[in-house]
Every structure is written in structure tokens, then in C-alpha cells.
């Protein structure tokens, strides 16, 4: 195959590029002979016409051009080195490389500027390989120069090799470095909107990994998880990626007016600015509200935000916020949250006390809590102001403490109730109620055609537990107010309710052991038959034995018992043995209501309190008091402090 024109003897003498330039300079109409002696042309020196620049340049101008070129090359080299070494800390939006690239690319050489290597493609791979080697610690002390084989197509050269000089090779490498560094700066630009985040399958894991890389601690080590976006909280921790620096400067000032405490930290990475903040809002907000507010203020999409409430019981998390708030990289405003202060400041550490069950029992007794759920919930609510409650929350035996506290409160309440007489108990219950009006109760009895004198006489014997008068039954048609009357009285006296539905169990009467008064509502024929067979002695008000679950039999005197029924045993002779043991009052009239559906006669605790106070002398409920008045103190179940005198 014949060689292409102008490609012989490549590497010796003039290169192929200069031969092509000589052919182009010929006139269009000139004809080149095939048997032209190429050696003669080389000897004549016509191919070297444009090789030497005969332009007269003054010494001062030549020196100025050299200095300008040297300055441009040094600026380029310094910028590239600075970008490689400190690319993590340099703002990706303003770089000296971007300012110097257009001028340097043209000032290196006018002839070199006309050359396009590889059809205008930029060599990116060499720079990335060099950066990877330097990041890994290898190849940092040597500069690898790899010559690229340039292919020729149709006699048109695409590159320069070998013999055309080392200066062109060095200048070409400088252009490559400039183009590569420009690509790196372009990748660091925030205008890409962190495209890499959208390419990964697990976005949350990618963000958490980048967060730990930047701040040295995992995001989930600082927060607790809220599964629902509707859960409200005053304290929130959020991390935001890809924030514009111009917006980041005024973020703290914008949000400070809405928060009681605000802690912000900013750092940079190849994704842009990254924000970590702890904020205590003036009002509780849910996650949807916080995310919507941050996305609007910082101009970022929702998937670039991680928002969770902070860990309040983690000493490590509290120490992180405390230590980072003392550094120059954080901006803090407002009062430090108490959960940080308690876990980091010495005075709070010294003030921590061990949990005391007696203090918890005293609190439950003073506030009238005997149910386990109420004790656990309300005692946890005062952990901010009570040191013992805070120690209770830190304990791993909270359930055990709650059970023990409820059991002790019930024991104290039961002993207190048994110690009191019926008059003292009614007075004790009346102290917990307001003062009402006794007349609605009397009017209701008159409305039901009950003689007040007879009712008060029976009520006095019933309250004092006189044998054969220890049970009162209210009978009548439905909707006459029998159950309403009895339930209101039981609520005021804090009595217990028993039900015949549990009669199949041997323990259905067990609650009578710990009761001051009791009530059995809606006694049917089966219940009357059961009472006539098994409960005659109980209705008498005499001592009887009650079976208790997991305990031995208890011998008790039946408390005053109130019954309601639609069956009047006075009219049935088969209950003749119960007629002498049960005092019967009949409610014949329907219970009255006004036009709004409210009861005409209000049966409240306040009205019952006024009723017993008004008729205390008739019911013989006077309590014995000293001449100076009552001097008893509230029960105290915590150990006192012994004062030692010198």
C-alpha cells in the first residue's frame, strides 16, 4: 500500500503537522509533480518558511510577555494544588481557577491554542486517577507522564508527538490540567442539586453515612424515632443537605424569633452546604410543619432533610450538643434546654438523688391516687420539678415501684377508713366536696310520696348498722330514679357496687370486706331467691364469713347495704323471711326532667354533703372535737429529719 502524502520520515526532521501546513499554503492552481524530489525540497528550506518568527520584538515587551506567562502558569499551578489539598474547605462556588482559566488557556501559546486534542474532548480520567492515588497515599512524589498514541485519519493529524519539542508536550499537559480542574469545580457546583443523592437506592442511608462522615457521630445517635409525621414536639433536630451559602448566612437570624433555643452548625462537602440544628420552638409542632417550613426557608427539596426529635435521656447526645455549642463553628441563642443542663452541668449532677419509694407513696396518698395507671402517668408528669420522680423515670423497675406504691396506698386508705366511724367518714368525704343545697333531695322524696321523718329514721339506723335494719330497698316501676338515687349516694360515700351477674363465683361478695357501704342494683326474682337462701345472716347485719380469692375466709360485719328492685317483697308471701330484714321504700312516679333533658332534682355530691350537714343532728352524726377545735394533722408516711443539737 502506498504511503499517504506528507507522512514519511515521521519523527525525524519536520513533523507531519508542518508538512500539512506547507501544502495548505500553496496556491490552489499549482500542480505538484509526482516525481518531485523531496530531498531537494528539504534542502531548499521552503518548508521551514513559517517556522521562524521574524517579527521584531523589543526587549522590554519580550520580558513583559514572559513575566505575564510565568505569572499565569504559577497562578494556575497554585490554584490546582490548593484545590487538591483543601478542596473540602474551599467554597465550591468561587474559585480562582474559574477566573484564570480563560486567560491562561489562551496565553500559554497562540499556536497551541489553535490545536484541539481529541476533537475537543477533555481528559478527565488522568486527573481523577491522580487524585485517587494522592488520596490513598501512593504516587504522590512522582508525576506520571503517559504519551498517548495519536491516530491519523485521511492524512489529517490529530495530535503532536515526539520530535516537535518538549515545550508543546508540557503546554498540552497544562491545558489538560486546567480543563480537568475546571471539571472538578463544575462537579462541586450546587447547581447540580446533589444529583448523586437521587442515583442511590437507599437515600436515607446515604444521608446518614455522609452525616457521620462530616460530624463524626451518627444521626440516629442524637435523635429518637417518631414513626408518625403528626406527632407533636417542641424540640427538633434536623440535618439539611445541599443548601445555598447565601441562604445559610441568614438562616439563624430568621429562625431565632420562633425558637426559645436554637443551635446551628454549618459545614461544606462536595454536595454543598450541610446544616445541623437543634431547635426548641415556642409551641409544639409536628414533623410535617417543620419540614415544610425548612424546605421553604432553605429552598431545598423534602428528601434532602432529616428531621427527628432529640434524645432526652442520652448523656452522650447531651454532651455532644454542649461541647459543639462551645466551639467557634456553632451559633447558639436562647436558654439551654433543661435536659442538656441536667446531664452536663455539675450542680445538676450533684443534685441527683436516689429513688425513694416512700416519697412516691406519700405523693400518691396526698393526691388520692390508688390505681396503678394513674400513679404511673401523673408521677411521670412531675419529673421536671421533682427529683424523686426524675429518679423514678431513670429506674429500670418502674412497673414494680408502681405496683408497690398502689398496694401501699390501698393499705393506708383501708386502714384510715376502718379507723373512722360513720360520722367521721361522712365528714371526711364532705371535706372533699363543695357546699351545695340539701332541698333537691328532700323535694325528690316528697315527689315520690315518702315521709321525710320515716325516711330519716330508717336512714339513721341504716348508717349505724343496727341489726335487722342494715338493708334498705327502693322499689318501683322502671324510670322512677331508683338507681340514680342510690348511685349518687354511693358516689358521695365512696361505697362499693356488687352485681348478681357474678354470683356463679364464690368471690362475688369479696368487695364487701373493704367497703364502708355497698349497693346491689336491680335485684331480680333469682337474686331474691338466692338472698333468701344464702344471705339472711348477711342482711341481718351480723358478723359473717366471706370467701376471698387466694386468701383465707374473712369474718366481717356486713356494711350498710342498699338495694333497688322492680319487685316489692312486701306483696309476696314467699319472701316473708326477708320482709323483717329489709326496709322498703317505694318510688311510684317517673323521674322528672326539664325541657332541656336535665334532671329537675340534682343529686350531686355537694347536695348530699349539705343534706348530711343539715340533718346531722337528726341522723346522730355529730363528731367529737376538742374545745380548741380539730388539731389533727394529715398523715405523713416519709421519715422525718432528726435535728441534733450541740
From Swiss-Prot:
Region called DNA-binding region, residue ranges: 186-352
Positions contributing to ATP binding: 476-483
EC numbers on record: 5.6.2.4
Location in the cell: Host nucleus
GO molecular function, one term: DNA binding
Catalytic activity annotation: Couples ATP hydrolysis with the unwinding of duplex DNA by translocating in the 3'-5' direction; ATP + H2O = ADP + phosphate + H(+)
Main location, first listed in the record: host cell
Name of the molecule in the record: Replication protein E1
Amino acid at each position: 500500500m502506498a504511503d499517504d502524502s506528507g507522512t514519511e520520515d515521521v519523527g525525524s526532521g519536520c513533523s507531519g503537522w508542518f508538512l500539512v501546513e506547507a501544502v495548505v499554503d500553496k496556491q490552489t492552481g499549482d500542480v505538484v509533480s509526482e516525481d518531485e524530489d523531496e530531498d531537494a525540497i528539504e534542502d531548499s528550506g521552503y518548508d521551514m518558511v513559517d517556522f521562524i518568527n521574524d517579527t521584531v520584538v523589543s526587549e522590554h515587551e519580550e520580558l513583559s510577555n514572559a513575566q505575564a506567562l510565568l505569572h499565569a502558569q504559577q497562578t494556575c499551578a497554585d490554584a490546582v494544588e490548593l484545590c487538591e489539598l483543601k478542596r473540602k474547605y474551599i467554597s465550591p462556588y468561587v474559585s480562582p481557577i474559574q477566573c484564570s482559566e480563560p486567560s491562561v488557556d489562551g496565553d500559554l501559546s497562540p499556536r497551541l491554542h489553535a490545536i484541539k486534542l481529541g476533537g475537543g474532548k477533555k481528559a478527565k480520567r488522568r486527573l481523577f486517577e491522580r487524585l485517587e492515588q494522592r488520596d490513598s497515599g501512593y504516587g504522590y512524589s512522582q508525576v506520571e507522564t503517559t504519551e498517548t498514541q495519536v491516530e491519523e485519519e485521511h492524512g489529517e493529524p490529530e495530535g503532536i508527538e515526539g520530535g516537535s519539542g518538549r515545550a508543546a508536550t508540557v503546554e498540552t499537559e497544562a491545558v489538560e490540567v486546567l480543563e480537568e480542574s475546571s471539571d472538578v469545580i463544575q462537579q462541586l457546583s450546587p447547581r447540580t442539586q446533589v444529583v448523586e443523592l437521587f442515583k442511590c437506592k437507599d437515600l436515607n442511608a446515604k444521608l446518614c453515612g455522609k452525616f457521620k462522615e462530616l460530624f463524626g457521630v451518627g444521626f440516629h445517635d442524637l435523635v429518637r424515632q417518631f414513626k408518625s409525621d403528626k406527632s407533636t414536639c417542641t424540640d427538633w433536630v434536623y440535618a439539611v443537605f445541599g443548601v445555598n451559602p447565601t441562604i445559610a448566612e441568614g438562616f439563624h437570624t430568621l429562625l431565632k424569633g420562633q425558637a426559645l433555643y436554637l443551635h446551628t452548625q454549618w459545614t461544606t462537602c462536595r454536595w454543598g452546604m450541610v446544616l445541623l440544628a437543634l431547635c426548641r420552638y415556642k409551641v409544639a409542632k409536628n414533623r410535617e410543619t417543620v419540614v415544610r417550613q425548612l424546605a421553604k426557608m432553605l429552598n431545598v427539596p423534602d428528601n434532602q432533610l432529616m428531621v427527628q426529635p432529640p434524645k432526652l435521656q442520652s448523656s452522650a447526645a447531651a454532651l455532644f450538643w454542649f461541647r459543639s455549642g462551645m466551639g467557634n463553628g456553632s451559633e447558639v441563642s436562647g436558654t439551654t434546654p433543661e435536659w442538656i443542663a441536667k446531664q452536663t452541668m455539675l450542680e445538676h449532677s450533684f443534685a441527683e438523688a436516689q429513688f425513694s419509694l416512700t416519697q412516691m407513696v406519700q405523693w400518691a396518698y396526698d393526691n388520692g391516687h390508688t390505681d396503678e395507671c394513674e400513679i404511673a402517668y401523673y408521677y411521670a408528669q412531675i419529673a421536671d420539678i421533682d427529683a424523686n420522680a426524675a429518679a423514678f423515670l431513670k429506674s429500670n423497675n418502674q412497673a414494680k415501684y408502681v405496683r408497690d406504691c398502689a398496694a401501699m396506698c390501698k393499705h393506708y386508705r383501708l386502714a384510715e377508713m376502718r379507723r373512722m366511724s360513720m360520722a367521721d367518714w361522712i365528714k371526711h368525704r364532705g371535706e372533699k366536696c363543695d357546699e351545695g343545697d340539701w332541698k333537691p333531695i328532700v323535694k325528690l322524696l316528697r315527689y315520690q310520696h315518702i315521709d321525710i321523718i320515716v325516711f330519716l329514721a330508717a336512714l339513721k339506723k341504716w348508717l349505724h348498722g343496727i341489726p335487722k335494719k342494715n338493708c334498705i330497698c327502693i322499689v318501683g316501676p322502671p324510670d322512677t330514679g331508683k338507681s340514680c338515687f342510690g348511685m349518687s349516694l354511693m358516689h358521695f360515700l365512696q361505697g362499693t357496687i356488687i352485681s348478681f351477674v357474678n354470683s356463679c363465683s364464690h368471690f362475688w361478695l369479696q368487695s364487701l370486706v373493704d367497703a364502708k357501704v355497698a349497693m346491689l342494683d336491680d335485684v331480680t326474682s333469682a337474686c331474691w331467691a338466692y338472698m333468701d337462701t344464702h344471705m339472711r345472716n348477711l342482711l341481718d347485719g351480723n358478723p359473717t364469713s366471706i370467701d376471698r380469692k387466694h386468701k383465707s375466709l374473712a369474718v366481717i360485719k356486713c356494711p350498710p347495704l342498699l338495694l333497688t328492685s322492680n319487685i316489692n317483697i312486701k306483696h309476696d308471701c314467699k319472701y316473708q323471711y326477708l320482709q323483717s330484714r329489709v326496709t322498703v321504700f317505694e318510688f311510684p312516679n317517673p323521674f322528672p326532667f326539664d325541657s332541656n333533658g336535665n334532671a329537675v332534682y340534682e343529686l350531686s355530691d355537694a347536695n348530699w354533703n349539705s343534706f348530711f350537714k343539715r340533718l346531722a343532728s337528726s341522723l346522730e352524726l355529730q363528731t367529737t372535737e376538742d374545745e380548741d377545735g380539730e388539731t389533727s394533722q394529715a398523715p405523713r408516711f416519709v421519715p422525718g429529719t432528726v435535728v441534733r443539737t450541740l
